[in-house]
Amino acid sequence: MSIDNSRNRLLRFGNSPDYASVVLKCKDVLKYRDTDVSVYRAIVDGNRQHPEDIALIFMGRRITYRELIAQADRVSDILTSMNIRKGDIILLGANSPQAVSILLACSRIGAGVMILTTRTNPDQFAQTIADMDIPIMFCTSDVYAYYAEGDSVDELSHVVILPFDLPIGEDTSAVEFDKGNSNVISWAAFLNFRVTETAEEVEGGYFTLTVSASTGTNGAPKGIVMENRSFIALEKILRCAGFCWNRGDIVSATLSTGVATGTSLLLLVPLIMGLTVLQSPRYPNVNPFASYLDDAAFYKANILCAPPSLWVAMISAHPEDVDLSAVKQVYSVGEPVSTAEYDMINGFLQSNHALDRLRNMYGMSEINSIATYAVDTLQSPVSAGVAVPYCSFVICDHDTLRELPFGEAGEVFIHTPTAMREYLYDPKETKEMFVRDEFGEKWVRTGDLGTLDCSGELNILGRISHRFVAPDGSYIYPYMIESVLLKMPEVLRMKMVNIVHNGSPAYALHVIPKDLSEDERLLAEKIYDALAKSGSITYLPHFIKIRDSFPRNQGGKVDMLKLAQETDGFIPLC
């Protein structure tokens, strides 16, 4: 059984070679047997000869692979004694070494982990508990307090409070929690649970490991079900693509386990490859954006990866010099990067002695991270790059699914062995997410607007859902506005949101200027005039808001939902 599409032919919806499909040229074929292994087994086998290598750095402590795997084994024995079996789902709301050992333990016994994020509100949490027979939740005390306001946590058999500030190997003591709830125990008490049954390792990789929420901009969180094989496939893709990730390299986990890229690209896959993951804690009294770079410098991190919005925030929060001379690879993920952002980030990297320039990558939560990578032959350094091995693209009309010629903008479809299995308990959304071509191959609908050239270089223009439908039925996309505004010397960044004005559809612009001291009204008028004179914008914005930053979600991206909900501070234009 093959899960691969890397045959020497075009994979496309149409039959003409002029259409925007990618020819796959991989030497090897990624087959079923290559990914039919659990993440736990891959990490154990991959580091068997290097047990004292450092797996995690957390709160100043270095945790070896031997320590991490030993705790994962202990946790899996305890979960088995608690009658947790293959196919069961537990809840996890933490980003710490304990959380990593829990992920590995569940991979060992075939259980799945539903990862809680800030986008999972108490009502959604209560619905999750009502819909699923979840026996146990692991979380920090603040996450527990957030959900304990309702009665849902009382329905769980156990709630285990994880010590945020203690790494593996420490003598953990109970943290403060509501001792009146008999189902709440400390991590120390959990580790002392009497083992009555030793865990049996579940073989294979085709069972659920994570259920995570999308951190994109397409609405409420969705339960994205990822199997073990998806993480294994991503590791093989990185090796085949020639990523220079070597044993002992330190990768900075700027994104938490609550984010798909944080769990896959910046945590589990590096552990499979024998890297060291720097888990950066977010202290409440410290600017986290500055601390990311401080930690990277102090621990001499070699690999940095973050969305453009997070890069800008880190740089803005760190005006003084920071030694990045150990950094050999730098990536941008999660959002398109503008030329201004690219120049700003690269200027910072160069001035602080990083050994590489920013390399853009593209992907989505539903494919477990990335589908493209930057190569030196790209026409544009801010493009999404070319397809990684075992992955291909096609550009289609969003409404008709008709395949489009090279260079024409349409929806991006992806074929990849890392794709999710389904949206949890949502067969309708799952069916709409996948499309099969004439060869029976399954493609993922991204909802992103993009173009593909004949060399296979992909350009992402934005989310299709962010387009504005003008009164005459024509579309105005954010990239059309950006193509005008980002050429203005006064504008650094810009986002467009749909609004309702006087009962009719309209759109507003959020703009970050290069000079925050410039008169806002004058700048708004300059922007309006530039759009009016461009000739390409047939329907002009009603409002502009000048601001110094954008809100970000847990994935580090611009939170478009929050922008759309803002109602004050706008300058009316028409």
Annotate each language-model stretch with its function.
Residues 69-77, 190-192, 205, 224-246, ...:
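Conserved structural elements of the adenylate-forming
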Residues 61, 77-120, 253-257:
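Conserved AMP-binding/adenylate-forming
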Residues 161, 178-213, 220, 243-250:
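Conserved pre-ATP/AMP-binding loop-to-beta segment of ANL
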